[in-house]
Amino acid sequence: MDLIKKLTGKNPDEYEAVAKSLVDNSDVNLFAKLVKQDDFLFDFVKNNVANRIKKVINKDNYLNLLNFLDNYSASYDSVIAEGLYNFGGVEILPALKEIFVNGNVEKKAYALKYFSLIPREYIEELLPLIRQTALSEFEPLSINSIEVLSKMDDEIFKSEALQRLNSEDEFEQYNGVKYLVAFKAVDALPQILKVMKKSSFSENIASEIPYLIPVEDLIKTEDGILVLCNIVSAIPEIIPPSAVIDYNLFSVFEDLYLNNLSSASAVLLRLAQEKFAE
């Protein structure tokens, strides 16, 4: 049977043996095949695989994980970073710094996931470079960079992202929004909403906001209702239909109808009715 099927399957004897062999033998080819399946596996399956890999990592084989870094996957970056940190601590920090400085974008993204687990003082000198990689067009590298900067409370990056909101270039404004959302800058919401109301990218901006503020909180204000109106309007042309599930929209609509009906929410509900009746 195909090893990927065994690793993702339900037979403990099979998936435990494959996971152990994967790490013990540093099977780069098998890991590369696993990463290529990312778009075809359900999230719960990938979570199962990550947990299976996690259970077989130990003090004797954790360094083998370094051989997997050319094949990036957001599904497995945490388990790899945690394995390296849990068994290598800061002793392997020099190796990860070298990978971050000189590696390809995939390796840099993994290194940053590791950096997100260690105290600021150990990577202080790398912060200027991390601010640069936060602007990378390789999204995992950007996201993982901003995660580190957020955990380090890096006010320089946050300030630069806020400045982008004042740009006359709407692409720059939108990038600023994405950076602030990834940074978890909740206090920037008023500025983000102000940009959204004026921007021709209002629907794109709206789609980012639920990753900063829960939809259940957004419905408590008229500005939040406007965010949801923009999101509904953008489905499916700009925002994929899966957003209905991601944002738990039907439950939100039901709550509005039963408990929080207002003139603003009535507009949203009417818009949703017309959109999803199509």
Predicted features along the sequence, with ranges:
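Core helices of alpha-solenoid repeat scaffolds
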Residues: 28-31, 62, 92-93, 123-127, ...
